[in-house]
């Protein structure tokens, strides 16, 4: 598979000092004057990719500011977007200096929760889709900035074609509740159809119907494609237990999902994404 297994790509590099300078609470990233900062971290759910992004962020902030200059209030929403809103509201009430919103629902909750506290998003595939920005040009503006985990979707399609040139039917398996997953499968579908594949959507609403939808997709497909998707990332064992015995290969949108149920991916490094 050569260089097709993992491709690291850091996107939208940001300095902490610049991010903290946005909005009304301007901050200089220097611990020399004795300032102490509180950073609220809202992570949608615990899985390998999001954990790595959070850890990369914490490591870099600690390196830049010093261990004694920053306190992290780290909260996990357990996959519930409503809990994201509750967490963000607590950060706003506590007047934290910065919010790290890890994953799209966390970013959406943060954007709705405050226009004053600086927000950094991470593990967000497409900010325009996430925030409903029709004319998104790569800059959100206001108090929001961040890093994107959008993989090279055209190259993922090309990789699938290189690995499985004789396949005809590709099943696109994704969570319909995740807007960025829809964006990815739409893009990959268009690329695969250019290459002559027949593609079919297999959307599940949550983890409860993943098994039945994955089974249907496996029965009808030569290859399965799953995008960068938080529900998939938390339930790779379900997919693996269905696709592996059926000998239907799975191409994935990121490294953590690939390690759980896939055969190949082109992926960013989520640790680097958080840095």
Task: Name these PLM-found stretches.
Residues 179-248, 254:
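Pocket-lining segment of extracytoplasmic ligand-binding domains
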Residues 38-58, 64, 73-83, 181, ...:
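Extracytoplasmic "Venus flytrap"
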Residues 76-135, 229-253:
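Beta-alpha junction/loop-to-helix N-cap segments that form part of ligand/metal-binding clefts
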Residues 39-41, 57, 145-192:
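An alpha-beta-alpha
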Residues 71-93, 203-219:
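Structural motif
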Residues 127-168, 268-275:
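Hydrophobic alpha-helical segments within soluble ligand-binding/sensing domains
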Residues 1-6:
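Short, Lys/Arg-enriched N-terminal segments with co-localized hydrophobic residues
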Residues 22-34:
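Sec-dependent signal peptide cleavage junction
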């Amino acid at each position: 598979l050569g260089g097709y297994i993992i491709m690291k790509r850091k996107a939208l590099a940001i300095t902490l000092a610049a991010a903290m300078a946005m909005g009304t609470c301007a901050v200089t990233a220097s611990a020399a004057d004795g300032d102490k900062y509180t950073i609220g971290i809202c992570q949608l759910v615990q899985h390998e990719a999001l954990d790595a992004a959070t850890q990369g962020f914490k490591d870099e902030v600690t390196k830049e500011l010093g261990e004694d200059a920053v306190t992290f209030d780290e909260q996990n929403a357990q996959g519930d977007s409503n809990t994201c809103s509750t967490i963000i509201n607590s950060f706003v009430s506590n007047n934290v200096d910065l919010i790290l919103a890890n994953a799209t629902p966390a970013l959406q909750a943060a954007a709705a929760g405050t226009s004053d506290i600086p927000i950094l998003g991470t593990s967000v595939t497409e900010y325009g889709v996430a925030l409903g920005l029709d004319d998104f040009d790569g800059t959100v503006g206001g108090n929001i900035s961040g890093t994107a985990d959008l993989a090279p979707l055209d190259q993922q399609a090309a990789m699938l074609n290189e690995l499985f040139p004789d396949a005809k039917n590709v099943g696109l398996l994704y969570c319909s509740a995740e807007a960025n997953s829809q964006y990815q499968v739409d893009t990959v579908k268009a690329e695969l159809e250019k290459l002559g594949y027949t593609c079919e959507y297999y959307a599940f609403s949550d983890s409860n119907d993943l098994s039945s939808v994955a089974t249907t997709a496996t029965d009808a497909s030569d290859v399965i494609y799953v995008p960068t998707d938080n529900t998939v990332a938390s339930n790779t064992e379900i997919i693996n237990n269905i696709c592996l015995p059926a000998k239907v290969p799975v191409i994935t949108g990121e490294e953590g999902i690939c390690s759980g149920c896939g055969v190949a991916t082109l992926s960013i490094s989520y640790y680097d994404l958080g840095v």
